[in-house]
């Protein structure tokens, strides 16, 4: 840790800040049943991937199908429930009180996030410092680009950053960025992610600035 640089906390969004992953699993499982019945548990298969990655891998050349899926997804995201992961707001407020910079670093696009801001304007009004979306980086998770951008916008170094992630791709990206990674067992089990993070937690209840700083040593 470089004490001449600020500390930054970089949060994935779905399954880390908002309790949305279960809803997405239902949506994508239905898409999988319709278009890829040979791939069971399609929702789990595409976790942590951008829409572009999903289309490139599973719907390449299927322009009409992509348009239909996107339209359905946009409707779904307008109507989905947006509830915070337990304890995350209090944790963010604790971080801000101690001068920690906070960014949401998400594979979601601006269209989806506009729905989020409408429901939770506090995200744009001081709860976090920056929100980095899929349009802002060339390579998506598991590449480290998004988290490295998080460090860059705050003028700090990877060793001063803590990443909070739930998906395998996100955990891999945080590690590839050379950052301390905390795993949320909201999407995958604690057992499944334990080797991919320095600490796994079920939510943010009881987690605070001091506990985070202890991970940085």
State what each model feature region is:
Residues 1-7, 93, 109-111, 115-217:
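Asp-based, Mg2+/Mn2+-dependent phosphohydrolase catalytic module
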Residues 16, 20, 106, 170:
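Ser/Thr-glycine-rich phosphate-binding loops at phosphate-binding pockets of nucleotides
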Residues 48, 70, 85, 89, ...:
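Short, structured helix-loop boundary elements
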């Amino acid at each position: 840790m470089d004490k001449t640089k600020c500390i930054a906390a970089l949060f994935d969004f779905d399954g880390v800040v908002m309790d949305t992953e279960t809803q997405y699993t239902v949506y994508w499982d239905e898409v999988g049943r319709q278009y890829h019945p040979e791939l069971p548990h399609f929702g789990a298969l595409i976790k942590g991937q951008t829409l572009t990655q999903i289309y490139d891998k599973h719907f390449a050349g299927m322009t009409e199908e992509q348009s239909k899926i996107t339209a359905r997804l946009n409707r779904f995201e307008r109507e989905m429930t947006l509830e915070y992961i337990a304890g995350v707001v209090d944790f963010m407020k604790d971080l801000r009180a101690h001068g920690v910079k906070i960014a949401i670093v998400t594979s979601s696009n601006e269209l989806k996030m506009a729905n989020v801001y409408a429901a939770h304007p506090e995200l744009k009004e001081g709860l976090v410092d920056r929100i980095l979306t899929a349009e802002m980086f060339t390579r998506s998770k598991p590449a480290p680009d998004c988290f490295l951008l998080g460090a860059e916008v705050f003028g700090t170094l990877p060793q001063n950053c803590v990443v909070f992630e739930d998906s395998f791709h996100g955990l891999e990206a945080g590690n590839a960025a050379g950052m301390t990674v905390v795993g949320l067992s909201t999407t995958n089990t604690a057992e499944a992610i334990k080797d991919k993070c320095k600490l796994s937690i079920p939510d943010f209840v009881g987690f605070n600035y001091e506990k985070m700083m202890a991970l940085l040593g």
